[in-house]
Each structure stands twice: as structure tokens, then as C-alpha cells.
Amino acid sequence: MNEALPVLYERHGEQVAVITLNRPEKKNAINLQMAELIRTYLRQADNDDSVHAIVLAGQPAVFSAGMDINAFHQGELPIVTPEGFGGLIHAQIAKVIIAAVDGIAYGGGFELALACDLIVAGQGARFSFPETGLGLVAAQGRCARLPARVSPYVALDWLLTGRIVDAQEALSHGAISRISEGTAREEALRIAEQIAGKDLAASQTVKAIVRQGLARQEAPSFAFQQGPVERLRQAAARR
């Protein structure tokens, strides 16, 4: 494992793969290199028959602050084809992915978590959606996915105000799966081991069925948002 890379890949036990965002000096802000590495590691884990579950984690104080805004203003987008933002938003991964959110998950950081199958949050986890304050819209998943997880009224509240949402509030609205007593990473690894101990084909089938239902809810929003969001993005890039 090359610890100088901004995303790390390692094994936990025999059946769990762990992908760790490793750019703490930038609060794990997602750039193109990170998106490419996330895509590579997800494919590696999904194609490895010995891997039965995947954990996506950040650092103890930060999951991800979202898109790298400095890179964005230089014309770089952390989007790869066909997986989309962060190499994950539209990724077709058969195995269960668990997001371990310790610290902040802002903007695109929360979008990455929403693209996972389970979200485990630490006691101090915080979520926020600051894009409207920057003249942007969370187009890579949240505007489409969040209303399918919480009510449309709660989604609009969070998206329009950009206020900070703590782990307890996120859990109360069904935006996350559970709050850990220790670190989210530790709890996510425990859950991953539990899932990995089940029948792999059965777990993949359950995921596929649930994801298909969610996709039908989300598809119209994903299709509608492309034009308006692209116009906003171009306007923001010119500022």
C-alpha cells in the first residue's frame, strides 16, 4: 500500500476491502486523481471473488469536505465515465458498500456517502450542503437521491439552507443507517464482517432489488437536472 496516494486500498481480514480517502491536508476534498483511484479500487474489490463487502472511510476528523473547489476553478472536475462524481455516484458495484463517516461530510462528501448502501456515522459526524451558497447545485446525486431517503420537505430544508445537520438528526430522518458508539470506521468494519459472513449471492440479490426500486424513483430527477445544473456550473466557473 502506497500511503502517499490520496486514496488507499487495503484488506481487513479475508473478505472485507477498505478504501480510505487519504488527503487530510485538504480535508479529503475530491479531485480527479481521487475519483480515478476510487473507481479503480471499487472495480478491483468487485472483481475479487474473495471480497464480500467494501468499506469506504475517511480520516478520524473528516470524511470529505466535498469537491476540490480550487481544482474546479482551474477547470478540473472529479468526474469519471461512467461512474460520475468521485468514481462512485453511478458506479455499478454488485457488492455491498458501507460508508464510514467520522467528522464532516459536506457537499460532494455526503454525495459519496449517499451512493453507498449503508452509512455509519460517528457521534461527531456532521453533514452540510453548502452548494447553493456557492451558486452551485449538488447535481451528482443528492438532489435526486436525498428526497428518496428522507421526505422532500426535509431534503429541501437541508439543500436550500445549507445548515449543518448532526448525526442524530440525520438518523432520525433516515438519511443514515446508524450511529456508532466508537468510531464509524470500527463499526463499519464490524458490519462488513457480519455481511461478509452471509451468503454472497443472497446479499448481492438483496442489494440489487433494493437499488432497482430506488433507481426508479431517482431516474426522472437525474434526467431533468442535467441542463439546469450545467448552466449553473458554467456560470460559477466564470466567476
Residue locations for each model-derived region?
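Hydrophobic/aromatic residues within transmembrane alpha-helices
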Residues: 19, 56, 68, 112-114, ...
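Short, active-site-adjacent cap segments at secondary-structure transitions
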Residues: 61-65, 106, 128, 210-213
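Glycine- (often His-adjacent) and acidic-residue-rich active-site loop
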Residues: 6, 58-92, 133-135, 216-220
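An acidic, glycine-rich surface segment that forms the CoA-thioester-binding/catalytic face
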Residues: 35-37, 43, 47, 69-106, ...
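Crotonase-fold acyl-CoA enzyme core
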Residues: 91-203
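C-terminal alpha-helix plus adjacent terminal tail
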Residues: 1-14, 63, 162-168, 179, ...
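Conserved CoA-thioester-binding segment of acyl-CoA-metabolizing enzymes
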Residues: 1-59
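Hydrophobic alpha-helical segments typical of transmembrane helices
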Residues: 84-86, 142-145, 154, 205, ...
